[in-house]
Amino acid sequence: MDPTSFDKTKLCFGKPTKFSKVAGAHIINIRYEDKVTKAKVPLSFHTPILFSFGAKTSSFQDGDDNWSMSLMCYDTNKGPSPQETAFIKALEAIECRVKKHLKDKDVKKATEMYQDPLIDMMSMFYRKMEDGVVVPDRAPALYPKLLKSKNNPGQVATGFYKFVRGKEVKIPVVKEKCRVLCDLAIDSIFLGAKPSIQIKLVDVFLVELIGERKKTLKLSKLPSAVQAEINKYSADTDEEEEEEEDNAEDTEEEEEEEADQ
């Protein structure tokens, strides 16, 4: 979904269900009502092109590898673009609806959780703080989780792709600084020690790998005299290597003859 077409009134919440892996925890699924079919479908957004420090892994209590990927919501030097502003506003609208839902008396009764101040503290974004105050002119960041493979434990199921000579190809997990376009899924609310909105990366499209150093010295761009000098000594090196190989073979033959005698 394009964030500009998001309608917060179409957001739907499932009934709280117990999360068996964590004692006392609950999960509330988040869905979106399709305007045409009225079906309740998973909610996902196509992000603008965003800067990332790359995917990182860390180990938690369950011992499995858990990956996340930073997404800076805009360039602080340029300020947010219209697309980035729409993206942030859509996420803020979801956050607002989630908080309102968690404060509903029936939800509180079903989950037996959370005073309103704790709900109000919940945020999808990481914002830099100093002395308890948000630092102005600093872009908010997201840290969505990468999907885990159900069939291959420990492996990432989120797809990473890029264009190579006009063709889309699958690539390994990107761990360096980069600019990416993502399919971002917002699938549930996790109710544990504190409430949190679960954000996951379904697919990541690599636009630019910033951490990769590009070669600046090209033989074809050098003056012809310089190219000739390089080629001259390159040829000498090849001849020296061949001569060394021949000498080594002669030495081996001499040693074999001495051994036979």
From Swiss-Prot:
<dbReference type="InterPro" id="IPR024416">
    <property type="entry name" value="DUF2738"/>
</dbReference>
<protein>
    <recommendedName>
        <fullName>Early 31 kDa protein</fullName>
    </recommendedName>
</protein>
<feature type="compositionally biased region" description="Acidic residues">
    <location>
        <begin position="236"/>
        <end position="261"/>
    </location>
</feature>
<keyword id="KW-0244">Early protein</keyword>
<feature type="region of interest" description="Disordered">
    <location>
        <begin position="230"/>
        <end position="261"/>
    </location>
</feature>
<dbReference type="Pfam" id="PF10927">
    <property type="entry name" value="DUF2738"/>
</dbReference>
